[in-house]
Design a protein with these regions (language model features):
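Structured extracytoplasmic
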Residues: 25-176, 183-189, 194-274
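Bacterial N-terminal signal peptides that target proteins for export
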Residues: 1-11
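N-terminal signal peptide c-region/cleavage motif recognized by signal peptidases
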Residues: 19-21
């Protein structure tokens, strides 16, 4: 998953007027188009403004296969999201982590080798539902219960991938899912993506690839970073299954994120001696 900071930042000023409480405070329920514009505005705000940051990441992953010993791993890490300059004078968001421990023991290496891994959510997960992605998605707004105005709006989506649009699409595999949106801020509270035929492992000249069903969820919560307020992942879950019956293999990944901090760049001037 790749962030596209440079492409979307231009629309920030135009769309901000439709974001936040403006939509939620109106007399009528916003249309699907208005909700997508609000999501796009918040996405642009995130892309243009989220600073380099770090937080605590506590992740558990497992692989369960019939006839094999279960493989479980727990990692405790410092997760980092760094805003990195590019040659074309734009910036991109790059994920990394410093692993502190594996299964409760101090880490002797920094390679996170599974059994289940996930990356890219911080870089571009919010792009799944946006005006920009209408060329790649079919969106529909779930019926809103007007007696419960504080309940999240729910937007359903399904990919429409073609040879012509695939290069512009955030999701590169046929998928469907739901986005739960806070009415007061037009921020994403929860994202769910189901990919029925996810490529788990690429094939080769000697073996076919491993394909399975992947179910992914991301919960978001507001975080104050310096003077800015951003909705960041608080929990990420993934479950992938391959095979059927007694031959079913299950991979799972679950991570929680806490204690967000903005990266501070400090400098110190050393005065030379006369």
């Amino acid at each position: 998953m790749v962030s596209s900071t440079c492409c979307r930042s231009v629309a920030l000023v135009v769309l901000l007027g439709l974001s936040g409480g403006v939509l939620a405070q109106g007399a009528k329920t916003p249309s699907l188009g208005e909700i997508l514009q609000g999501l796009e505005a918040n996405l642009n705000h995130y892309d243009a403004g989220v600073p380099s940051l770090f937080c605590d990441e506590y992740a558990t992953s497992s692989r369960i296969e019939p006839g094999e010993r279960d493989y479980n791993r727990v990692t405790d890490s410092v997760f980092r999201l760094r805003r990195t300059p590019q040659p074309d004078h734009t910036t991109s968001l790059v994920e990394s982590r410093e692993i502190k421990s594996f299964d409760g023991k101090p880490a002797t290496a920094q390679k996170m080798d599974g059994p289940a891994l996930l990356s890219g959510i911080f870089e571009g997960g919010l792009a799944v539902a946006s005006v920009e992605q209408t060329k790649c998605m079919n969106y529909s707004l779930q019926r809103v219960n007007k007696k419960r105005p504080s309940e999240p709006y729910v937007v359903r989506f399904a990919t429409v991938l073609t040879a012509q649009n695939r290069g512009d699409c955030f999701l590169q595999e046929e998928s469907k899912g739901r986005v739960f949106i806070d009415p007061a801020s037009m921020q994403v509270k929860r994202l769910e993506i189901t990919t029925p035929h996810h490529m788990i492992e690429d094939g080769s000249a000697y073996a076919t690839g491993d394909v399975g069903r992947r179910e992914l969820s991301v919960d978001y919560a507001p975080v104050l970073l310096g003077d800015g307020r951003f909705w960041m992942p608080s929990a990420i879950g993934m479950r992938t299954t391959s095979g059927s019956g007694f031959d079913t293999v299950v991979w799972s990944f679950r991570a929680v994120y806490r204690n967000y901090h903005r990266m501070e760049v400090t400098s110190r001037i050393h005065e030379g001696k006369d």
